Design a protein with these regions (language model features):
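Catalytic histidine neighborhood in serine/cysteine hydrolases
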Residues: 204-223
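Conserved alpha/beta-hydrolase catalytic His-Asp/Glu region
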Residues: 104-110, 122-182
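Conserved alpha/beta-hydrolase "acid-adjacent" motif
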Residues: 196-202
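Active-site glycine-rich loops that stabilize anionic/oxyanionic intermediates
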Residues: 9-12, 74
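Active-site loop/oxyanion-hole signature of alpha/beta-hydrolase fold enzymes
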Residues: 15-71, 82-87, 235
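Short beta-strand/loop motif that positions the catalytic acidic residue
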Residues: 183, 189-191, 195
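Flexible "cap/lid" loop of the alpha/beta hydrolase fold
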Residues: 81, 85-86, 90-129, 134
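Catalytic histidine-centered segment of alpha/beta-hydrolase-like enzymes
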Residues: 221-234
Length: 249
């Protein structure tokens, strides 16, 4: 049995991992799904993903786990990699979903800061229509209106101040490739085949940095593969979790 923290995407809810949490628990693993976009997680700290990494470690410690595996999607993946910088010796396994190890380009960072400024001015109402095409794959948008509607609801429910903070933190994040290169516990990379934000080349680069770990490609899914194809992602995560030794590292 592994203790596992599931770290959600931006700007969504921990509920995005409901099916994966059920599948992992059914396989005998203990699962905690921290909320990363709350005042409790952020406090009054300056924007820095290390703050969220500290929060995850504290949540897991409170749950009785000094060592644990971590699976993060998109922003959750960035936080997972920040956790490696903070306390890699406490991480028994790593799953990176629809994320990237590279830092933002100057253009991408500028876009994040402009997004944050607009949310600070206008709130979240404009965000779903402006971002849903990037977040969800073409197949999901065309055939799964219930998924589109659920993602819209999660976005609109997000705390705008936390969203601003998180975008600023992600814009400033460092490259994490070197952190992956020294991590040699059970790892997997998962990517939606229709993900345009963190596409397959980014996934392959992370897998190579991790020493050639498996890459699970999820068909007909975009950036939010865990929501778009929950059963396929659940199977990939259970297969990974089953490789983690109890009590490791």
């Amino acid at each position: 049995m592994a203790a596992i923290a599931l770290l959600h995407a931006f700007p969504l809810s921990p509920a995005m991992f409901d099916e994966q949490a059920r599948a992992l628990r059914a396989a005998g693993h203990e699962v905690v799904v921290p909320d990363l976009l709350t005042a409790t997680a952020i406090g009054d700290a300056q924007p820095d993903l290390g703050v969220l990494a500290h929060h995850v470690r504290a949540v897991m410690s409170d749950a009785g786990h000094s060592t644990f595996a971590v699976a993060g999607l998109s922003m959750g993946g960035y936080v997972a990699m920040a956790l490696l910088r903070l306390a890699a010796h406490h991480v028994s396994g790593l799953a990176l979903l629809d994320t990237k190890a590279t830092a933002d380009s100057e253009v991408a960072a500028k876009g994040r800061l402009e997004y944050a400024e607009r949310v600070a001015r206008e709130g979240m109402d404009w965000v779903p229509s402006a971002t849903i095409e990037a977040l969800l794959g073409e197949t999901t948008r065309a055939t799964k209106p219930e998924v589109v509607a659920q993602v819209d609801r999660w976005i609109l429910a997000a705390d705008s101040a936390a969203v601003v903070w998180a975008q600023q933190a992600m814009a400033a994040r460092p490259d994490s490739t070197a952190d992956l290169a020294v991590f040699r516990r059970p790892a997997v990379v998962i990517v939606g085949q229709e993900d345009t934000l963190s596409p397959l080349p980014e996934a392959l680069a992370m897998a190579a940095a991790l020493g050639g770990v498996p890459v699970a490609e999820i068909p007909t899914s975009g950036h939010l593969s865990a929501v778009e194809s929950p059963s396929a992602v659940s199977r990939a995560l259970v297969a990974w979790a089953d490789r983690i030794s109890p009590g490791a590292p």
